[in-house]
Amino acid sequence: MKTQRQQLILKLIASTPIATQDQLARELRRRGLRVTQATVSRDIKELGLIKVPAGENLYRYAAPPGQRLINPYGRLQRLFADSVTKIDDSENLILIRTLPGTAHAVASCLDSLDWPEVIGTVAGDDTILVIVKPKEAVATVLQRFRELGEG
């Protein structure tokens, strides 16, 4: 959800002059997303959006020069294929083993996907603990991980 919302924000600011957070929130709501001003503010910060001149005494949001549309799922697919060595589970916990030094990057991508069943991740150097709620959703999350690993 978060990833799709942020991608939509990047598309909106590229195609429509948006000057305020309130205006951006209205545009997102018009497209069926339920957002608050606080959510929009966090998205703007995470995306690193800047204000650029848009005429005399007018400014609009823009992506920093050289920024592409984000695709954490694609990045996660590459990281999974290159880094994950083993996946195991018990109850509502999934343990992911990775090559040394890559667990934080994989966990960060997992967090950015905003899967509702994943309530959190904890990463060490080569191990990630994924906490799933409810525990019945573990099979679904494991299937997603398998699909990621297959690329």
From Swiss-Prot:
Function, as annotated: Regulates arginine biosynthesis genes.
Main location: cytoplasm
Pathway(s): Amino-acid biosynthesis; L-arginine biosynthesis [regulation]
Pfam families xrefs: Arg_repressor (PF01316), Arg_repressor_C (PF02863)
Domain of life of the source: Bacteria
GO CC terms of this entry: cytoplasm
Compartments where located: Cytoplasm
Protein name: Arginine repressor
Annotated family: Belongs to the ArgR family.
Gene Ontology terms for molecular function: arginine binding; DNA binding; DNA-binding transcription factor activity
InterPro entries: Arg_repress, Arg_repress_C, Arg_repress_C_sf, Arg_repress_DNA-bd, WH-like_DNA-bd_sf, WH_DNA-bd_sf
GO biological process, one term: L-arginine biosynthetic process
Alphabetically ordered keywords of this record: Amino-acid biosynthesis, Arginine biosynthesis, Cytoplasm, DNA-binding, Repressor, Transcription, Transcription regulation
